[in-house]
Swiss-Prot record:
GO terms for cellular component: chloroplast. Heterohexadecamer of 8 large chains and 8 small chains; disulfide-linked. The disulfide link is formed within the large subunit homodimers. Mg(2+) binds at K146, D148, E149. Binds 1 Mg(2+) ion per subunit. SUPFAM superfamilies: RuBisCo, C-terminal domain, RuBisCO, large subunit, small (N-terminal) domain. The keyword Acyltransferase does not apply. The keyword Transcription does not apply. The record marks K279 as: Transition state stabilizer. It is found in: Plastid, Chloroplast. The gene is rbcL. This is Ribulose bisphosphate carboxylase large chain. It comes from Aegilops tauschii. GO terms for biological process: photorespiration; reductive pentose-phosphate cycle. It catalyses: 2 (2R)-3-phosphoglycerate + 2 H(+) = D-ribulose 1,5-bisphosphate + CO2 + H2O; D-ribulose 1,5-bisphosphate + O2 = 2-phosphoglycolate + (2R)-3-phosphoglycerate + 2 H(+).
Length: 421
């Protein structure tokens, strides 16, 4: 029923079935296996002919595969765990605007994760105070600051004012530090036309990156913005706001690895991926599975990490995963070990909550990161020696020592809801 409803079938036989080749176009369920440890749950493998899908359209792909079938009365629950995108179809998508290597070349930063910070409070600041917070963070050692996902154009801070003050913060901090800086200017808007207008203004200001909420904004809007960013040299940061409504429950919806694959096809240079160690949901092996699906060219099937199919992206550029949500300096060794160099480690409260202010908060994060990268390059085990490495760095960084004292007892030890088992 699932295969039929998402391809050529309906609830009854219709006379127009005779006007086409149903055998050519229908979806086929080719394998069924029980879910281990569960009664009345099965994993079904369904294959669809490529001719059912419009080239280069994530919107059409999802409309077909996860359309009406999820509302069937006959089904108590239904979840899309994974998709295999054949190279023949993935080559019809242009993917990320630039990709990992081009971004590194634009920023001239290599050999370490990038550092970011979400400006808090996320709502309520005036544009001038918002820009001031960005400046203090960027001059303290950050690579990026960020609009939160729901910062668009509200009465207390209109988008054009925010863009101008953030651009000023970028240029001042670049002049002071000699490093290339950026701020994720959220271009998400109520219409595609308004979204592109905001991206155009960001380009005119000369900033390096804009941002989009790809699930609330929609895949059509996201792909539209991706094309503009590629044509105009802007990096594109993607926030996944609303994803947990879709992916968090184990028995209904779809897994985030599917949304991650869809984003890589639709286009984005960064996407939030969870942290494993922070405040947001995410089991380690499962998170690393879809992080590899975002970054790597070829990923082998590995059910232990939740990867149901071998995926070959051919020449499609990779996406940088962003670890963000409830992280602080004590998490730095684990984050460096888990995510590696091609990642963005984004500290919001873990920067702005520093007792001495924003710039010292960023200095603490930068020192902690540099210490972890140096220790890793020397062959030390970050998982086992992480706390020792951070304590040693505190001896020559009073900013880091103060941060460690503030957050020494902050932990988020909750069992994940969505697990591989």
């Amino acid at each position: 029923a699932v295969a039929a409803e998402s391809s050529t079938g309906t609830w009854t036989t219709v006379w127009t079935d005779g006007l086409t080749s149903l055998d050519r176009y229908k979806g086929r369920c080719y394998h069924i296996e029980p879910v281990a440890g569960e009664d009345n749950q099965w994993i079904c493998y369904v294959a669809y002919p490529l001719d059912l899908f419009e080239e280069g359209s994530v919107t059409n792909m999802f409309t077909s595969i996860v359309g009406n079938v999820f509302g069937f009365k006959a089904l108590r629950a239904l979840r899309l765990e994974d998709l295999r995108i054949p190279p023949t179809y993935s080559k019809t998508f242009q993917g990320p605007p630039h990709g990992i290597q081009v971004e590194r070349d634009k920023l001239n930063k290599y050999g370490r994760p990038l550092l970011g910070c979400t400006i808090k409070p996320k709502l309520g600041l005036s544009a001038k105070n918002y820009g001031r917070a960005c400046y203090e963070c960027l001059r303290g050692g950050l690579d990026f600051t960020k609009d939160d996902e729901n910062v668009n154009s509200q009465p207390f801070m209109r988008w054009r004012d925010r863009f101008v003050f953030c651009a000023e913060a970028i240029y001042k901090s670049q002049a002071e530090t000699g490093e290339i800086k950026g701020h994720y200017l959220n271009a998400t808007a109520g219409t595609c036309e308004e979204m592109i207008k905001r991206a155009v203004f960001a380009r005119e200001l000369g900033v390096p990156i804009v941002m989009h909420d790809y699930l609330t904004g929609g895949f059509t809007a996201n792909t539209t913005l991706r094309h503009y960013c590629r044509d105009n040299g802007l990096l594109l940061h993607i926030h996944r706001a609303m994803h947990a409504v879709i992916d968090r429950q184990k028995n209904h919806g779809m897994h985030f690895r599917v949304l991650a694959k869809a984003l890589r096809m639709s286009g984005g240079d960064h996407i939030h991926s969870g942290t494993v160690v922070g405040k947001l949901e995410g089991e380690r092996e499962m998170t690393l599975g879809f992080v590899d699906l975002l970054r790597d060219d070829f990923i082998e099937k590995d059910r232990a990490r939740g990867i149901f199919f071998t995926q070959d992206w051919v020449s499609m550029p990779g996406v940088i995963p962003v670890a963000s949500g409830g992280i602080h300096v004590w998490h730095m060794p684990a984050l460096t070990e888990i995510f590696g160099d091609d990642s963005v480690l984004q500290f919001g409260g873990g920067t702005l909550g520093h007792p001495w202010g924003n710039a010292p908060g960023q200095a603490a994060n930068r020192v902690a990161l540099e210490a972890c990268v140096q220790a890793r390059n020397e062959g030390r085990d970050l998982a086992r020696e992480g706390n020792e490495i951070i304590r040693a760095a505190c001896k020559w960084s009073p900013e880091l020592a103060a941060a460690c004292e503030v957050w020494k007892a902050i932990k988020f030890e909750f069992e994940p809801v969505d697990t591989i088992d």
